[in-house]
Amino acid sequence: MIFKFFEAIGKRKCSIAKISLFSTVKYNCGVININGKHAYEYLQKNCNPFDFLKIKNYNVCIYVKGGGLIGQAEAIKLAISRALKSFLRKKKIKKLKDFGFLTRNSSCKERRKYGLKKARKAPQYSKR
């Protein structure tokens, strides 16, 4: 039986994570699927707001694309935190904010400039 349903999007570098969060009652508790795989198979790093807040009664279905594993993990973390924010109490929301789960890291790849080989790598300078 499903009580609540939330959707959220998280971004980090080139990664985009779209999640669907379901509130459940004991049946199949705490299942997190990422692109059809279990979360612990897909990600090696555990940066999960559920573990941080000790919440167990939510099922999460995640579709993530682009970037590498760390960027995807950060995008998933942000998306889950945004979905949890919509129904948690203010005390727990403040806890999420204090530990940086709700802030988006806006740093991304710098663009290549003309006259240079990469974003900042210049050709070798010859004085004569």
Swiss-Prot record:
PROSITE patterns: RIBOSOMAL_S9. HAMAP family: Ribosomal_uS9_B (MF_00532_B). Disulfide bonds: none annotated. Coiled coil: none annotated. Keywords: Plastid, Ribonucleoprotein, Ribosomal protein. This is Small ribosomal subunit protein uS9c. The keyword Ribosomal protein applies. It is found in: Plastid. GO terms for biological process: translation. InterPro entries: Ribosomal_Su5_D2-typ_SF, Ribosomal_uS9, Ribosomal_uS9_bac/plastid, Ribosomal_uS9_CS, Ribsml_uS5_D2-typ_fold_subgr. Its main location: plastid. Signal peptide: none annotated. The keyword Cell inner membrane does not apply. GO terms for molecular function: RNA binding; structural constituent of ribosome. Belongs to the universal ribosomal protein uS9 family. GO terms for cellular component: plastid; small ribosomal subunit.
